UniProtKB/Swiss-Prot annotation:
Record keyword Transferase present: yes
Keywords: ATP-binding, Kinase, Nucleotide-binding, Phosphoprotein, Serine/threonine-protein kinase, Stress response, Transferase
Record organism: Caenorhabditis elegans
Protein name: 5'-AMP-activated protein kinase catalytic subunit alpha-2
Biased composition (Low complexity): 542-555
Function: Acts as a sensor that couples lifespan to information about energy levels and insulin-like signals. Role in motility and response to oxidative stress. Involved in the establishment of germline stem cell (GSC) quiescence during dauer development. Plays a role in axon regrowth after axotomy in PLM neurons. Plays a role in the maintenance of glycogen stores which are necessary for resistance to hyperosmotic stress. Plays a role in the regulation of flp-7 secretion from ASI neurons.
Reaction it catalyzes: L-seryl-[protein] + ATP = O-phospho-L-seryl-[protein] + ADP + H(+); L-threonyl-[protein] + ATP = O-phospho-L-threonyl-[protein] + ADP + H(+)
Gene Ontology, cellular component aspect: axon; cytoplasm; neuronal cell body; nucleotide-activated protein kinase complex; nucleus
Tissue: Expressed in the pharynx, the ventral cord, neurons including the hermaphrodite-specific neuron, body wall muscles, the vulva, the excretory canal, and weakly in the intestine.
Length: 626
């Protein structure tokens, strides 16, 4: 059966260094004793359940006794209930190193939650403040059908209460102990869900580092929920980790040897051990004597039963490769033929790169609403435009966008349905939008901030203007009309992606260099999109790479205006475009919607870059509005 000795020692051993430094335990015991131990575990669990049922029956009989004692006892029980926030604490689910996990009942909805109670004094004495902080930070943003959800954190002077998703199916460890080795289809289903959750973590720069069946919970439908992110760590490009984390039986060779490792490869190794346990009911590397266990892990040699299919054996050997450079990646696992069989669509929703290039303004607003951040929309924009993909605001934004894409785990939705988002309170007023410049145009842009909390350097910069056209048509229809208008105006353009182009007027002379303008499509809310007009004059005047600059633009609320013009038979019906001009602070551009392209300046004098930018915008808007 499934023997797992690290369950009792994983809290005592944080690893690190060579295995010979650890305290040796007794030599390996015969397999018969393991079976006795597993049977004893089952019997003890059964006896505990019987005692619990008996106590419950006794309590019920007392409550049903005649007389007025029933209501009195009920009132006493209600008074004795412990309430934290909107949650009433019930029975204890388990006891850990830092505190207890109790069942909580939301007093309004009566939904069950799991309340993890962390004692502040224990946290400080054990020097695990960073561990707890990492778990809270990661779980508060993770929204995946197979990762445990953290709803709320309540702090008191003595304790920290983590209000988490309640799952009633117990640990995957107990499930394996009860059922032994699983059928291939069931093992594959569990494994697919685990890999989906791990891939989600890695894509958002988090490694778990303690994956094992005890940290994999099951809900009432036997769906996996990854829990316990206390040992997780944020990945940073170029950085390596040395900390020995996790349980010895599931730890990769480089971890127990104290070598440097990047992060994702250790999770892949742990997933390989879990897959072996699911299919075989035992562990690939197991020994009561810790130094012997470490020698087995470092050798990478494990038994492969005859009942395992050849594709499974190949996958296991690829995942449990001692050399981390040759070890399978998560992408390799997902692409494997055995893994792909009966793979549900929702686990890995396809990401359309063109759709991904459209910035979700609702997601930006949601990031600003996190009380822990206290940031303005411009700061989120700056993080998205910056060179650091691991910025905490960028990670938060991407997590929110991913949450909108991932469907419920029991539904099988089409690709289009993955992008249907239901706003909480309907579409709100249009705020200023973030600007996203492709890497080929600008490596980093430092925006001008209007809020008083901005840095001194940014406070001295002039306020930004924004210019755009808002439409409820499909993105491809909007861009079709944009390209049609640019062609009609005889402009030149360069396509960065289907929703981002650089445009300019055709030069009057070979030596002329007309100012360029960026057209970028953004998603405003569920039903509408914003076509942003942005001047690139400052970037041109700075340097070829255009690392950062101020820019001229302006914001435009819109008046409906129908679009006329021929359309090919392959395109849908004409869209309804909105365009109008907001109140200006400096100039009155009420005549910008003219139908003709403005004539060149008299005398050949050059117009200012800003005025030329406005004239190009006016020409495009006028053409689109016809």
């Amino acid at each position: 059966m499934f023997s797992h000795q690290d369950r009792d020692r994983d809290r005592k051993e944080d690893g690190g260094g060579d295995g010979t430094e650890m305290k040796s335990k007794s030599r390996s015991q015969p397999s018969g004793l393991n079976r006795v131990k597993n049977l004893s575990r089952k019997l003890s669990a059964k006896s505990r359940k019987e005692r619990k049922d008996r106590d419950s029956t006794d309590n019920s009989s007392k409550m049903s006794s005649p007389g007025g004692e029933t209501s009195t006892k009920q009132q006493q029980e209600l008074k004795a209930q412990i309430k934290i926030g909107h949650y009433i604490l019930k029975e204890t689910l388990g006891v850990g190193t830092f505190g207890k996990v109790k069942v909580g009942i939301h007093e309004t909805t009566q939904y069950k939650v799991a309340v993890k109670i962390l004692n502040r004094q224990k946290i400080k004495s054990l020097d695990v403040v960073g561990k707890i902080r990492r778990e809270i930070q990661n779980l508060s943003l993770f929204r995946h059908p197979h990762i445990i959800r953290l709803y709320q954190v309540i702090s008191t002077p003595s304790d920290i209460f983590m209000i988490m998703e309640h799952v009633s199916g117990g640990e995957l460890f107990d499930y394996i102990v009860k059922h032994g080795r699983l059928k291939t289809a069931e093992a594959r289903r569990f494994f697919q869900q685990i890999i989906s959750g791990v891939d989600y973590c890695h894509r958002h720069m988090v490694v778990h580092r303690d994956l094992k069946p005890e940290n994999l919970l099951l809900d009432e439908q036997n769906n996996v929920k990854i829990a316990d992110f206390g040992l997780s760590n944020i990945m940073t490009d170029g950085d390596f980790l040395r900390t020995s984390c996790g349980s010895p039986n599931y730890a990769a060779p480089e971890v127990i040897s104290g070598k440097l490792y990047a992060g994702p490869e250790v999770d892949v190794w742990s997933c390989g051990v879990i897959l072996y346990a699911l299919l075989c009911g035992t562990l690939p590397f197991d020994d009561e004597h810790v130094p012997s266990l470490f020698r087995k892990i470092k050798s990478g040699v494990f038994p492969t039963p005859d009942f395992l299919e050849r594709p499974i054996v190949n996958l296991l050997h690829h995942m449990l490769c001692v050399d981390p450079m040759k070890r399978a990646t998560i992408k390799d696992v997902i692409a494997h033929e055995w893994f792909q069989k009966d793979l549900p669509n929702y686990l890995f929703p396809p990401i359309n790169e063109s759709e991904a290039s459209i910035v979700d303004i609702e997601a930006v607003r949601e990031v600003t609403e996190f009380q822990r951040y206290h940031v303005a929309e411009e700061e989120v924009t700056s993080a998205l435009l910056g060179d650091d993909p691991h910025h905490h605001l960028s990670i938060a934004y991407n997590l929110i966008v991913d949450n909108k894409r991932i469907a419920d785990e029991t539904a099988k939705l089409s690709i289009e349905e993955f992008y249907q988002v239901t706003p909480n309170k309907g579409p709100g007023p249009v705020h200023r939008h973030p600007e996203r410049i492709a890497a080929s145009v600008s490596s980093k842009i430092t925006p001008t901030l209007d809020n008083t909390e901005a840095s001194g350097a940014n406070r001295n910069k002039r306020a930004k203007w924004h210019l755009g056209i808002r439409s409820q048509s499909r993105p491809e229809d909007i861009m079709f009309e944009v390209f049609r208008a640019m062609k009609q105006l005889d402009m030149e353009w360069k396509v960065l992606n289907p929703y981002h182009v650089i445009v300019r007027r055709k030069p009057d002379a070979p030596a002329a260099d007309p100012p360029k303008m960026s057209l970028q499509l953004y998603q405003v809310d569920q039903r509408s999109y914003l076509l942003d007009f942005k001047s690139l004059a400052d970037e041109e005047s700075g340097s070829a790479s255009a690392s950062s600059s101020r820019h001229a633009s302006m914001s435009m609320p819109q008046k409906p205006a129908g679009i006329r013009g021929t359309r090919t038979s392959s395109m849908p019906q004409a869209m309804s475009m909105e365009a109008s001009i907001e109140k200006m602070e400096v100039h009155d551009f009420s005549d910008m919607s003219c139908d003709v392209t403005p004539p060149p300046s008299p005398g050949g004098a050059k117009l200012s870059q800003t005025m030329q930018f406005f004239e190009i915008c006016a020409a495009l808007i006028g053409t689109l509005a016809r």
